[in-house]
């Protein structure tokens, strides 16, 4: 936290001494930049972003600039820190006459503040931003957060009802701290359905190793005896689907970001749909149509706004379970059920049941 504070504070001091000579872009054709970590064709998180911005390009005729972060450490620049490498990649995108610049993922939280103050002529959007605490979101920037715990709760409930084992698996990548809303929402859903079930959490060393994901999933299914695995591990997580398909139709997976049942039709029991592309499309199209950007705020989206939802396929779940999930959805939307997004909130949730 101290490191993050110093990083942002120094950025603000630099900006305070810097008078930008760049003029606001005055062009009929809107230019939108997108910077992400990993492939835009990951069948999940970045794919949702890609689909949204491509739809934006096709419908409005914008110029679209997309870039993935270079793999770190960068060949020939091994002395660069991770933050410096990300900044270089962002500057590369900003060589274009951008109107809007979307930064995809929590890792850009600090950088988005720095860039916003350096380039007041560009509007920025950060997806899945960290909690900025007392730091004010710049007027030309917009932070978007999602109530991931709400859909994770429903996924946990479904997993508990469908599992043939007494353990449920949860697989993340190396940076799992920012996924606590998913974890404790999922855990709460399991507990709500069956307090006797146990959550087995594992952390993969990389987000880009599909074979490692498969090996870890095989171990979780066969040795840990989990009945369902919920992977949030990028490309690594796709290995879970391969493991489940190899073991057979009784080994279940929960998809994320898109309906991923097509990857393993006999194994995927539900998917959390987190339509990031829909949010980007909505905000960007408002700017394109009206040249209005409502910055300086944090936007929160969940079940109520229709941005996050859970797949309820009656051919996979029985009709009774579908009805139960719909009932739980309504209770979450109405506020009757407050889904926990942290360990403390989870303990409080348990104590009230």
From Swiss-Prot:
Lineage: Bacteria, Pseudomonadati, Spirochaetota, Spirochaetia, Spirochaetales
Coiled-coil regions, chain positions: none
Pfam families associated with the record: Bmp (PF02608)
Membrane topology: Lipid-anchor
UniProt signal peptide: 1-16
Location in the cell: Cell inner membrane
Keyword field: Cell inner membrane, Cell membrane, Lipoprotein, Membrane, Palmitate, Signal, Transport
Protein function: May be part of an ABC-type nucleoside uptake system involved in the purine salvage pathway.
GO CC, any one term: plasma membrane
Principal location: membrane
CDD domains: PBP1_PrnA-like
The gene coding this protein: bmpC
Oligomer status and interactors: Monomer.
Lipidation (S-diacylglycerol cysteine): 17
UniProt source species: Borreliella burgdorferi (strain N40) (Borrelia burgdorferi)
Lipid-carrying residues in chain (N-palmitoyl cysteine): 17
Xref: InterPro entries: BMP_lipoprotein, Peripla_BP_I, PnrA-like
Name recorded for this polypeptide: Basic membrane protein C
Protein family: Belongs to the BMP lipoprotein family.
């Amino acid at each position: 936290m101290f490191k993050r504070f110093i990083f942002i504070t120094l950025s603000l001091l630099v900006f305070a001494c810097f008078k930008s000579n760049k003029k606001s872009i005055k062009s009929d054709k809107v230019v939108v930049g997108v910077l992400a970590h990993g492939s835009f064709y990951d069948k999940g998180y970045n794919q949702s972003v890609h689909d949204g911005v491509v739809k934006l390009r096709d419908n409005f005729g914008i110029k679209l600039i997309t870039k993935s972060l270079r793999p770190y450490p960068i060949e020939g620049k091994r002395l660069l820190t991770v933050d410096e490498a990300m900044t270089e990649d962002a500057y590369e995108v900003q060589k274009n006459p951008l109107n809007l610049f979307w930064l995809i993922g929590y890792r850009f939280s600090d950088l988005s503040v720095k860039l916003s103050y350096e380039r007041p002529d560009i509007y920025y959007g950060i997806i899945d931003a960290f909690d900025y605490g007392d730091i004010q979101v710049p007027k030309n920037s917009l932070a978007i957060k999602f109530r991931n715990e709400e859909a994770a709760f429903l996924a946990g409930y479904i997993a508990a009802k469908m599992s043939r084992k007494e353990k449920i698996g949860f697989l993340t990548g190396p940076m799992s701290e920012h996924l606590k809303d998913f974890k404790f929402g999922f855990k709460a859903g399991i507990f709500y359905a069956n307090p006797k079930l146990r959550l087995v959490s594992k952390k993969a060393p990389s987000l880009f190793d599909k074979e490692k994901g498969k090996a870890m999933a095989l171990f979780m299914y066969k040795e840990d005896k989990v009945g369902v695995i919920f992977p949030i591990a990028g490309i690594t997580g796709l290995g879970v689907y391969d493991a489940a398909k190899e073991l057979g139709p009784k080994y279940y997976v929960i998809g994320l970001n898109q309906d991923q049942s097509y990857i393993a039709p006999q194994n995927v029991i539900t998917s959390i749909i987190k339509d990031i592309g829909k949010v980007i499309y909505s905000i960007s199209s408002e700017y394109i149509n009206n040249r209005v950007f409502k910055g300086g705020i944090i936007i929160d989206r969940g079940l109520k706004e229709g941005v996050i939802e859970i797949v309820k396929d009656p051919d996979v779940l029985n009709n009774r379970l579908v009805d139960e999930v719909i009932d739980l959805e309504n209770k979450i939307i109405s506020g009757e059920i407050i889904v926990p997004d942290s360990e403390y909130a989870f303990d409080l949730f348990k104590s009230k049941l």
